[in-house]
Amino acid sequence: MKTLKHHAKRIVENFYLVLILIFLYAPIVTMMVLSFNSSKSRTQWGGFTLQWYTQMFDSATIMDALVNTLLIAFVSALIATIIGTAASIAINSMKPLPRTIIMGITNIPMLNADIVTGISLMLAFIAFGISLGFQTILIAHITFNIPYVILSVMPKLKQTNKSTYEAAMDLGASPVYAFFKVVFPDIRPGVLSGFLLAFTMSLDDFIITHFTKGAGINTLSTLIYSEVRRGIKPSMYALSTIIFLAVLVLLLITNFAPGRKKEEH
């Protein structure tokens, strides 16, 4: 009787899991299939084609948006990683109470609604007389990426042995040399994960970018939004598919990085 109940429970659990996966990924799979459909119809299959991908890469508007997206994602992730790593070191050296308070404040931007962050940054830029454009998107992305870097680096810093750093200093090493030779190798997996996570978050962002971009500049997410409002084109399916696959690859790299595997073993 117990065995029968156990099997029934497993069947229900597996069915529930499959149902969740279908609801989550069926729309994405449908979009990916339509990106290879030669027919513009969303209900009829006209045969396999790559013309929508060719059309996408031939579009100057899409290529400009792609360059903007990659440039903003890379630069913002790089700067956020540098600032976030430095901030993590400073926070880690604090006493327990102020460290807890600062970490709580740091976590607020991650818990805050993107629309609130986007509007707040837009109003701040306007108040300081900064014209909305490429630079404001970059600043906004650096701002919301820093907490994610701190979140990735802090656990690694807590695992480091402070005595080795102090020993290097006692042996005559400068603080910078001691950091890069002793501390950085230990926190490197966390720094790399923070960079990849920041790059992914920047690549995928729409709401904050929408409020801080100004006129005359687009990223892939804002371009897709503006194009969809005029009517869905098959090239948008192709573009969305590429974005999804790019984000998926980055997440896989982040989760299966050599440093993380080593840590788990």
Predicted segment positions?
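Membrane-interfacial helix termini and adjacent extracytoplasmic/periplasmic loops
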Residues: 41-43, 50, 115-144, 176, ...
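Hydrophobic alpha-helical transmembrane segments of multipass integral membrane proteins
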Residues: 63, 67, 71-83, 87, ...
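N-terminal, non-cleaved signal-anchor transmembrane helix
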Residues: 1-60, 64-67, 71, 258-265
